[in-house]
UniProtKB/Swiss-Prot annotation:
GO cellular component labels: cytosol
GO biological process: fructose 1,6-bisphosphate metabolic process; gluconeogenesis; glycerol metabolic process; reductive pentose-phosphate cycle
Sequence similarity: Belongs to the FBPase class 2 family.
Binding site for Mn(2+) 1: D33, E57
Source organism (scientific name): Prochlorococcus marinus (strain MIT 9312)
EC number: 3.1.3.11, 3.1.3.37
SUPFAM superfamilies assigned: Carbohydrate phosphatase
Catalytic EC class: hydrolase
Summary of subunit composition and partner proteins: Homotetramer.
Name of the protein: D-fructose 1,6-bisphosphatase class 2/sedoheptulose 1,7-bisphosphatase
Cofactor(s) annotated in UniProt: Mn(2+)
Gene3D superfamilies on file: 3.40.190.90, Fructose-1,6-Bisphosphatase, subunit A, domain 1
Protein's job: Catalyzes the hydrolysis of fructose 1,6-bisphosphate (Fru 1,6-P2) and sedoheptulose 1,7-bisphosphate (Sed 1,7-P2) to fructose 6-phosphate and sedoheptulose 7-phosphate, respectively.
NCBIfam families: glpX
Length: 333
């Protein structure tokens, strides 16, 4: 992996974001996702690499493009594994709400955990709290530790939690400690990464979300030096979701075992979910969010706002790109 490849990876998420953004606010979440998938797949196909999708849009029989195991790129060059979410927060995009983005993680072949399409209990926190907070602790314990690490009182802390029924007790506990809760409807990747930057107003992410997005978050937090832990959730009673209507706890355990995951209660650290020597996170805003703006369409250009975090050179690059249209007459600053 090199800087040229990283630049091309940036362009992958930019093109996906632009494609989705054309449908922002139209209530067409599936169409927005499909547009992002197609644009991402098209741009990946132009990269000189032996790419492979390890986390994508589903199994081969479930998705026409960017399915798990799909080979992408020219077929020659460096081996790169990808975890992708071309339109993270499809509902946010469809309803023109904050926080939707095109996002991916990339690493050398074998460098990303092939997370099953399960749920994951997650804990993200700033670099100052790395290795000090722990997902095994109660929320109360972690808030006390976080308060000490950041030299803030607990009532100055803000914790992002997915707005789900399963988090009722968690939210009650956090508020009972005096900390603020910021519920979000979708899109916990951006919230997790925001914990890694001071000044975002986000100090911690707690609770259960999708496991594939956990790998993408872990890649970013590993590159940032932040704290991230994840533990797979295989009990539908804990996840409290209708998506697993046909699955039982026993059936999910069997699925994990068939995938080679025998330590089903393992707590994964960021460097286990994203273990490659070189790890890259790339995200581009579809709608405005915590970290960057969404796509802006102007008469003569399209503007994108993106973030690339890389272990290759230990950088986090915020990038504003002007995509100039054919026949443009004037580009404003």
């Amino acid at each position: 992996m090199n800087q040229t490849l990283i630049q091309e990876i940036l362009e992958v998420v930019e093109q996906a974001a632009i494609a989705s953004a054309k449908l922002t606010g139209l209530g067409q979440k599936d169409e927005a996702d499909a547009a992002a998938v197609e644009a991402m797949r098209l741009r990946m196909g132009k990269i000189e690499m032996k790419g492979k999708i390890v986390i994508g849009e589903g199994e081969r029989d479930e998705a026409p493009m960017l399915y798990i195991g799909e080979e992408v790129g020219s077929g020659s060059g460096p081996g790169v594994d990808f975890a992708v979410d071309p339109c993270e927060g499809t509902n946010l995009c469809a309803n023109n709400q904050r926080g939707s983005m095109a996002v991916l993680a990339a690493s050398d072949t074998g460098g990303l955990f092939n997370a099953p399409d399960f749920y994951m209990n997650k804990l993200a926190a700033p670099p100052a709290a790395k290795g000090k907070v722990d997902i095994r602790n109660s929320a109360t314990e972690n808030l006390k530790i976080l308060s000490d690490c950041l030299d803030l009182s607990i009532d100055e802390l803000t914790v992002v939690v997915m707005d789900r029924t399963r988090h009722k007790d968690l939210i009650k506990e956090i508020r009972g400690c005096g900390a603020k809760v910021q519920p979000i409807s979708d899109g916990d990747v951006q919230a997790a990464i925001a914990c890694g930057f001071a000044g975002t107003g986000t100090h911690c992410l707690m609770g259960i979300g999708a496991a594939p997005e956990g790998v993408i978050s872990a890649a970013a937090m590993r590159a940032l030096g932040g704290h991230f832990q994840g533990q797979l959730v295989y009990d539908p009673a804990i996840a409290q979701t209708s998506e697993w209507a046909d699955y039982t706890k026993e059936g999910n355990i069997k699925r994990l075992n068939e995938m080679g995951i025998t330590d089903i209660d393992k707590i994964y650290e960021a460097n286990e979910l994203a273990s490659g020597e070189n790890v890259v996170f790339a995200g581009s805003g579809i709608t405005d969010g915590l970290l960057f703006d969404g796509v802006k369409f102007e008469r003569d250009c399209v503007r994108t706002s993106s973030l690339v975090i890389s272990t290759l050179d230990s950088t986090a690059r915020f990038t504003n790109t002007v995509h100039i249209k054919d026949g443009a007459k004037s580009i404003s600053l």
